[in-house]
C-alpha cells in the first residue's frame, strides 16, 4: 500500500508518516516548509522517517500543479492524507488571499490530482 501525506514535516504529518511506515506502507511526504514555525523544527520532525527505505520526501507546494502531476504520475497511491495548509486564525485575518490560495486552491489541486489518477481514499484535516 502506498500513501501520500501532505504537510509531512509538521507535527501531525510527521507522526502520520511514522505510523504508516511502521504499519508497512510506502510513504511519500510532501511539505513546503512554510515559515509558520522554524524549518529546523520541521526538518527534525522528519529525521526518523527519512532513514526509512519506505519513505520518499518531496519539497514543494500543493499549489504547484506540475509538481503534483509529477508525484502522482510516478506513484500509484491507495490513499492521500491531506494535512498541508496555512494554519493560524489570527494571521489569516491579515493575509486572506494567501490563506485562501493555499487552503482552498491547494486542496482543489490535491483533489484534482486524485481524480485524474483514480485515488479514491482521502483523509483530510482542516487547519485551525
Predicted regions and their residues:
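N-terminal Rossmann-like NAD(P)+-binding domain of SDR-like oxidoreductases, especially those catalyzing
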Residues: 1-128
